[in-house]
């Protein structure tokens, strides 16, 4: 403003000098408010005067002002660029540090630190973050392109105070790994949604991605493309506080291992995996183990033809009332240890079509199936099984059991212990030991031979050459004479 005023004064002075030779009397008669005619103003040469004005020294106030670089200067000289700062609509947030693709804020109200990322985000962390890592509670990544291996990126060792992460409207095509990304963190909320994959996804592993995130209560993974993922082992293991989880959209066609995937998700009451393609999966060990609250689980369409390990697959799914495994192809399975152990509420299991010709371990397979009343596994081939310890232990409601093709295993400790309701046992002649079977009266239903204790039953059974059915209790004999007949105790 001062520079503009000086220029006006100089121009006016020149005009007065130029008009000095004019008729004074005429000038005096004119109204001083009138403007000079345009032709007179246009004839004035003020170039020298303006040049002189520009050459003058700058006022002191102007000298003290910083020069503002032009856009061209900024582009040509990166040293004058300011650190990039992401815009924030929150008036309580104050920028404390920033870089090319990130900004760290401090909330002036609660003194919490947050990190926002944008643009091209690499998988490495800048050293500038080091002094803030222990304080950052919230991370937001929006409209960014993530590239590389993000294994353990948000875990407890990296951000010990982290409570929430949001990854939204990002290009995740270039991410190769999210293994242990949130492992063992105290995180409570993770939102991964509305993301873009302009090229084929590179994500190969989500192993333990949320493993041991036992404070996690809100999780949205709808924006995660899993079509290339081969490893989902322990992905949600020990998410003990999580009550809801939608994975119905997961493309699991490339997955080979689901070991422990949902193990110890103790508060989940439903899980929709009904449309999953599991044709490539080789291990399902503990995939749903310890999902204590799970009430609804449909695995009827699972393709298990490639699975070799079903150890503890449904172990301690206490609340599950129905389980349809009738279509399972178990021809490649070698391990079934504790597969159905702890299914307290399931009253019926149809495993009659199971091919167990390669299975070596069946110990605790039906342990604590307290509501199971009938079990037909007469088709089981146990010729390779070495361990049947506690196979039916505490199946307290089981009334009938069919073991047509069973053979004696190396270890069979407490195989029938706790089967207090068992009244009928149809068993192969190649199974000679009934460890734990109730020591009471039994009889051969075909030959009507009575046994007063378990020892007599086993001795008799070892002499049989074909499968035999035994019933608990004492049979009544009918004695006929000329006067009629009467039942007598055996």
Task: Enumerate the language-model features and the residues they cover.
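Bacterial N-terminal signal peptides that target proteins for export
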Residues: 1-9
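Low-complexity, acidic Ser/Thr/Pro-rich repeat tracts that form intrinsically disordered stalk/linker regions
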Residues: 3, 22-112, 488-489
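Leucine-rich solenoid repeat scaffolds
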Residues: 401-475
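Secondary-structure capping and domain/repeat boundary segments
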Residues: 475-490
